[in-house]
A protein has these predicted regions:
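Histidine-acidic metal/acid-base catalytic patches
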Residues: 2-34, 45-57, 173-188, 192, ...
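Active-site acidic/histidine proton-transfer and metal-coordination neighborhood
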Residues: 13-21, 48-51, 91-190, 199, ...
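Charged helix-capping and loop-helix junction motifs
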Residues: 76-82, 109, 138-146, 174, ...
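Glycine-rich, proline-tolerant flexible connector loops at the mouths of alpha/beta enzymes
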Residues: 63-83, 133
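Alpha-helical scaffold elements within enzyme catalytic domains, especially in hydrolases
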Residues: 53-56, 87, 114-117, 148, ...
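Hydrophobic faces of well-ordered beta-strands that scaffold small-molecule active sites
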Residues: 33-39, 62-64, 95-99, 123-125, ...
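Active-site beta-loop-alpha junctions enriched in small/polar residues
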Residues: 38-42, 65-67, 100-103, 128-130, ...
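Catalytic domains of carbohydrate-active enzymes, especially glycoside hydrolases
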Residues: 50-67, 118-119
């Protein structure tokens, strides 16, 4: 297994080097991605230290995570909302969204108001199971159960993004398609995580196109060797674009085709949770920027 992983890692590294040899010009990048920075990539690092990294990573906003994977959401409550607002203004950073798996889809009312108050536009959480004889019926009943949350989201101008998390109702390709078809509002969409899907570049592109305007968020995140057991750092980083073997070219082509104008997050999970993906705040930003460079090369070579 280790030898196979090492071959995959070397293969991916070689491919990344090959892409690096291809020059990328502004003219070639007719389609561009807008990036958001996930605070969880820095573990429990202080927000004061993370916020300058938003601009350095070419992002325009931040995704705030709570305890479990990070603790920046709790940091905000400790420092106070006025202090958080001051920090955002000082570093010229916007709150993009919060990720609240801890709340689930039925307890988002207060968080939606928080996000709105800071100019954010989205909350991501997971799905809940629902009754039904078929997968489509279960998805339909889940969507119907969100009617009050959708109404508040519409009133506030906030989107609820449901991630296709493995083991949840919205996890398979079919469930994602049903969910996007049945969502009655642009304020309820899919937060698409390739990590939790078969590592098939064409399937990923198909799901992006099918989701279309219901694609609320895209994680540039592949499965690699997974994220549930300790492993050497190079193997853990196989979750990142340009490190693992998943080709994101078809994905960016599909994103361009649907004129995707929401955010992309360079993403992964470390083991254990709650630590930075690599040691050192600047080093985390460097790793994210390397993955972004891969995404830019993917755009350039697809000609979108």
């Amino acid at each position: 297994m280790v030898k196979s992983c090492r071959r995959s890692f070397l293969k991916a590294t070689g491919a990344a080097v090959a892409y690096a040899a291809t020059p990328v010009t502004a003219a070639e990048e007719s389609f561009a991605l807008s990036y958001m920075l996930a605070s969880s990539m820095y573990g429990k690092t202080n927000l004061e230290e993370i916020l300058p990294e938003v601009k350095r990573t070419g992002s325009d906003s931040i995704d705030i995570w709570p305890m479990g994977h990070a603790n920046q959401r709790e940091q905000i409550e400790t420092m106070g909302h006025d202090r958080f607002r001051d920090l955002l203004e000082r570093h010229e950073v916007r709150l993009g969204m919060t990720t609240r798996y801890d709340l689930g889809p039925y307890r988002l009312q207060d968080e939606m108001n928080f996000v709105k108050a800071f100019g954010g536009h989205q909350i991501v959480c997971g799905a809940k199971n629902a009754n039904g004889d078929t997968l489509k019926e279960k998805v339909s009943n889940f969507v119907k159960s969100l009617s009050e949350a959708i109404k508040l989201a519409e009133d506030l101008g906030v989107t609820i993004g449901i991630e296709n998390h493995s083991g949840s109702l919205i996890s398979s390709a079919d469930s994602i398609k049903y969910f996007c078809d049945l969502s009655p509002s642009k304020h309820l969409g899919i937060a698409l995580a390739p990590y939790h899907l078969p590592q098939d570049a064409n399937l990923l592109a198909e799901l992006i196109e099918h989701s279309n305007d219901k694609l609320a968020h895209f994680y540039a995140w592949q499965h690699g060797m997974g994220c549930h057991k300790p492993m050497p750092k190079p193997l853990e980083l196989l979750q990142l674009p340009g490190h693992g073997v998943l080709d994101f070219g078809p994905a960016v082509t599909a994103l361009a085709k649907i004129k995707y104008d929401r955010h992309v997050e360079i993403f992964m999970h470390p083991t254990p949770r709650g630590i930075p993906i690599v040691d050192g705040t600047a080093a985390v930003g460097d790793v994210i920027n390397q993955a972004k460079e891969y995404m830019s090369r993917a755009i350039a070579r697809t000609g979108v």
